[in-house]
Amino acid sequence: MNGAGEINASRHRKENELKTCQILGAPVQSGASQPGCLMGPDAFRTAGLTQVLTELGWAVTDLGDATPTVEPELSHPNSAVKNLDALVGWTRSLSQKALEMARSCDLPVFLGGDHSMSAGTVSGVAQRTAELGKEQFVLWLDAHTDLHTLHTTASGNLHGTPVAYYTGQSGFEGLPPLAAPVNPRNVSMMGIRSVDPEERRRVAEIGVQVADMRVLDEQGVVRPLEAFLDRVSKVSGRLHVSLDVDFLDPAIAPAVGTTVPGGATFREAHLIMEMLHDSGLVTSLDLAELNPFLDERGRTARLITDLASSLFGRRVFDRVTTAF
């Protein structure tokens, strides 16, 4: 074969290679106030997530479920803090797994599990981003900012702390040191509608970008999301999306222990996922806080699976592009 033929053959192989996705269950429930999140990964599997992504043209590998490292029992001066040793074990394990997955596939997906899982998943993918010499960005779709530290949490439920941890805030003694903290100004939150005073102060202090539900009511989801995606694109950054079930209105997604009225609608959520797909910027994904014990015949698991499929390329409606 001549040189031109070899180049064309190589290009043809690359064009026909499937994008790779690895799925990892993170059956974490030690950070939540109610039991049940440990069943989340299997509920997503039962809802057909792997099959849907395969049908969309992805080469999907399910790695099973992660397990936490075994840690000594830990106490903290804040007596409200619960299950600190479990948080350390899960963070250490998931961070290493996330790093390995980000090195070996195009788009890792982490199935929760309560949102404390993101202390590990985000810190792991951020380490890979640093290896590549790029900037890590995070889109946090949630009713809560999750910006407490071990010292400020009043409930002691550690699913309220991951953003403060992975952005390198102080107050996490005993947790694994961060190899690559995420710049808090690279974190964009949408759907926020329940914030404690200490978290409100920290948002202003560190520069996290917040589009709460009032902003979404007044501007819609398009303007704030487009502005954020433009920032990511301009620096060729890598984008981690973390979707908490309570981002959605509990009327359509009841399977979460932290319901807050007034969440995102089905249409708003699908539009966000379609915009993310169109951007081509997403490099990793969390699906967090699914509690099947609180679900209605798998309704929420199916909805989140449907949203994930939109992010991976399935559309609610096929759109015709018109040239003007």
Curated annotation (Swiss-Prot):
Its EC number is 3.5.3.1. Mn(2+) 2 binds at residues 142, 144, 244, 246. Its cofactor is Mn(2+). InterPro entries: Arginase, Ureohydrolase, Ureohydrolase_dom_sf, Ureohydrolase_Mn_BS. The keyword Manganese applies. Pathway: Nitrogen metabolism; urea cycle; L-ornithine and urea from L-arginine: step 1/1. Induction: By nopaline. But not by L-arginine or L-ornithine. Binds 2 manganese ions per subunit. The keyword Manganese applies. Substrate binds at residues 144-148, 155-157, 196, 258, 289. PROSITE patterns: ARGINASE_1 (PS01053), ARGINASE_2 (PS51409). It comes from the Bacteria. One of its GO terms (biological process) is arginine catabolic process to ornithine. Keywords: Arginine metabolism, Hydrolase, Manganese, Metal-binding, Plasmid. GO terms for cellular component: cytoplasm. Signal peptide: none annotated. Belongs to the arginase family. Homohexamer. This is Arginase. The gene is arcA.
